[in-house]
């Protein structure tokens, strides 16, 4: 990572990212968080500098940002934060934990995050601002759209397509060749055996739609 990084957010997901960055010997200039009570505190030894307005003190040419907002509960906010700072000219660092296994031909979009123990097999493509969370397994030739979240322990079999801003919950399994549309939600532990349309929520074994 050629430039020092600024972490946006000081919550649980940000903490995991800071650990991954420190394990990769990245230089972290500080953390930004809107909570005034956190100003001056540290997250894993990294100082909280203040709220997002502090970012203007770091020109886009001198830092990269890392989106520390998690997807669960704040998916729209996470995307808004990414879009806001991209519009201001900032770039987002791609974070890959040293213990992750990523095939040499995998395409990782700007700001993609690949957490500890994850596996991404050959021919796969991961979009911008995605989270491939702890121990997720992405098999060959999968496509994960921008802003999607593949939660801890998820298994995507070969040739799966996941649409933009879709959430695949913890421990879910998706069999080979399945297509999941944009803004869909797959609940934790679901087993997906047929295609899922856009903006659809599914749960259960096998996965079925719910309101």
At which residue positions do the language-model features occur?
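Short, glycine/charged-enriched secondary-structure capping and boundary segments
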Residues: 20-23, 44-47, 79-82, 108-109, ...
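Short helix-capping segments at alpha-helix termini
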Residues: 24-25, 86-90, 194
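Alpha-helical elements of the RecA-like P-loop NTPase motor core of helicases
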Residues: 15-19, 76, 194
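Phosphate-bearing ligand-interacting subdomains
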Residues: 39-97, 101
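Flexible, glycine-rich phosphate/dinucleotide-binding loops
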Residues: 14, 37-38, 101, 209-211
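A solvent-exposed beta-alpha-beta segment
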Residues: 2-67
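Structural signal for interior beta-strand "rungs" in well-ordered beta-sheet cores
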Residues: 94-210
